Amino acid sequence: MKKIVLTAVLMTGMGAVAQTPAAPPPMAKPGLTLTTPAFDDGGIIPNKYTQAAETGVAVSPKLTWTNVPDGVVSFAIILHDPDTSLNKTTSEVLHWMIFNIPGTARELPEGVPTQAQLPDGSIQALNRGQKVGYMGMGARAPGPYHHYTYELYALDTKLSLGPDATQADVMKAMDGHIVAKGVLEGRFHRP
């Protein structure tokens, strides 16, 4: 009789264990996120940041990033217009390329100075207009809006490149070192 009771108790206990639901999986951490207070992702880029700026000089928008993974040594930002290559036979237009932004940074201010090397060690390369720094958007109207893509790369290294680096040079140097990527897109054509 003792054997039967003990077996029944053990089986009841095992059944309770078998019916205990598994712990839920941990929530996935959101990926690297790039934002700006200047416009919503996918929204219209204000003239201030374009070749249609009232002052005649476009300024770069403030950019902020969150959800940075561990192990980031530096960041790179590439701003380009892929619609140019889709609509014509020319390559996409590079509007801005800045790299070796310190891994501790979480934003760039509005109006980054147009100089090759910034005080924090960041390096700005030549844009499509063959000038250092940010070049505002200039898609002509009438016509469809162009989509301007800001790509933020979190890297596990600094790039051994100077301001004469091309977009191809930067992409090659980043190969195998990209920890995370965030994207922000805006639309524009001249009024």
Segments (PLM) and residue ranges:
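Sec-dependent N-terminal signal peptides
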Residues: I4-G13
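Sec/Tat signal peptide C-region and signal peptidase I cleavage site
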Residues: M14-A18
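N-terminus-centered regions that define maturation/targeting leaders and the start
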Residues: Q19-P191
